[in-house]
Design a protein with these regions (language model features):
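Bacterial N-terminal signal peptides that target proteins for export
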Residues: 1-9
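Bacterial N-terminal signal peptides
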Residues: 9-17
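Nuclease and nuclease-like effector domains acting on nucleic acids or nucleotide cofactors
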Residues: 3, 16, 20-24
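Charged, low-complexity intrinsically disordered terminal segments
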Residues: 21-136, 140-422
Length: 422
């Protein structure tokens, strides 16, 4: 009996040691994937993932895909501008509609007032619908304006349920050629093919039904077309997990925030993050600081010249706080870096519309995805290293030397008190 007891005891100890060893060897992508599945988020296999960092290449491929569409083109952007690029996009959509494709287009109404395709007026909207485009604007902006603080900041496209686009580019001339006030435009978008497009298609359809004036009916994805994608999944298959922030489903209010926090908490070696705005919510800040405090190497570039002065004040002040916890911060020069990306430990990356500010993390409708693919993450890391060559190193001495006390004081106010509103 005593011998049996000792054997059981040794077996239990051995199992405990094996479990501890397995846990210690878990990589960031494994930890993050487990969290996302526990939250009910779906992992989709992708056939191919292509990265874009300039608007010309992205639009060239997008318009070619629209021209080759056979059944449907669903397109959702914050901005489709009333300029040469926006009109060219409408022209390609019109041709797709003439070929018999189902063409749906959705843009945010508030931004249309400022830079949109004449969509504020009924005449402007009717002129687009007359082209065969089923067009809606998200949440018409009207009195009382305080009821319309939640805007559609997403940038997603679904073509024939087999090609999808997601990222940070809108459809406007300055997303290709830049703006005189802050130089060129640098951004990140990805093109995904295969079964992984289902997630984007579902997000679009849900939004279209929730706030649009059309798009009624249940959406059905033809999974049988991608049976081979699902059958042949292995450890080398790129996998995509989408997450969003939106009020169509109350459970989605914190989904983006919690997913990003989980990514920070999963990191063991490196976090590389790009965002034009560095005014995250308190919980996201704490996750970043936790990663730094446990020795994770964190690199954060942001634009030296921003598109809004008030946000720039806050960016610099929060960057100073990150420095004090050991982060490596860089200032991107020469153009406006609008990317919203993150790479964790070289194993998983994030691309989408989510900025690191309260507006994106609490208020706006957003869409992004984690890409579980070392090849894609390595390519984003390579681009990140190239971008660092266009950066100045940010330090406390640099901050005090280059920016007057008045600027630094404004940054303190924005970072401390106005962060929840930006």
């Amino acid at each position: 009996m005593r011998t049996l007891t000792l054997r059981i005891l040794f077996a239990c100890i051995a199992c405990a040691l094996l479990c501890a060893s397995a846990s210690a060897q878990e990589t960031a992508d494994t930890i993050l994937m487990r969290y996302l599945r526990q939250e009910g988020l779906i992992s989709y296999p992708a056939r191919d993932i292509r990265i874009y960092t300039n608007g010309h290449d992205k639009l060239e491929d997008l318009f070619r895909d629209i021209d080759n569409a056979k059944k449907k083109v669903w397109i959702e952007y914050l901005i489709i501008a009333n300029d040469s690029v926006g009109k060219l996009c409408i022209s390609h959509l019109e041709q797709a509609a003439r070929r018999g494709c189902e063409v749906r287009m959705m843009t945010d109404d508030y931004k249309d007032w400022e830079r949109g395709y004449g969509m504020r007026t009924k005449e402007g909207m009717d002129s687009i619908r007359s082209l065969g485009i089923d067009f809606v604007t998200f949440d018409r902006f009207k009195f009382p304006w305080y009821n319309h603080v939640y805007r559609d900041h997403r940038k997603i496209v679904n073509i024939d349920d087999s090609i999808g686009y997601i990222g940070g580019f809108n459809i406007a001339d300055y997303y290709v050629n830049g703006n005189p006030s802050y130089g060129g435009w640098h951004d990140t978008h990805i093109r995904i093919t295969g079964a992984a497009v289902e997630g984007m298609a579902r997000y679009f359809h849900q939004q279209y039904q929730y706030r649009g004036t059309g798009g009624k009916g249940k959406y059905t994805f033809a999974r049988y077309l991608f049976d081979e994608d699902y059958r042949n999944v292995n450890e080398h298959t790129p996998k995509v997990v989408y997450f969003e922030l939106g009020r169509a489903n109350k459970q989605k209010k914190a989904e983006a925030r919690n997913a990003i926090i989980a990514a920070f908490d999963a990191a063991q070696d490196t976090i590389r993050m790009v965002s034009p705005y560095l005014l995250p919510t308190h919980t996201v800040r704490q996750a970043m600081i936790r990663a730094l405090d446990r020795g994770v190497h964190v690199e954060v570039p942001f634009p030296k010249k921003g598109d809004m002065d008030m946000l720039s004040y806050g960016n610099f002040h929060f960057a100073k706080r990150l420095l004090r916890h050991g982060a490596h911060v860089f200032l991107y020069k020469g153009s406006f870096h609008h990317s919203k990306i993150m790479m964790i430990d070289g194993t998983v990356s994030m691309v989408g519309s989510v900025n690191m500010n309260s507006r994106s993390l609490k208020w706006d409708y957003e869409a992004a995805c984690f890409v579980f693919d070392r090849k894609t993450t390595a390519e984003l890391d390579r681009i990140f290293e190239e971008d660092k060559l266009q950066c100045d190193t940010f330090s406390l001495e640099y901050y005090k030397r280059e920016f007057p006390r008045k600027f630094r004081h404004k940054g303190w106010w924005v970072d401390r008190f106005l962060t929840p509103f930006f």
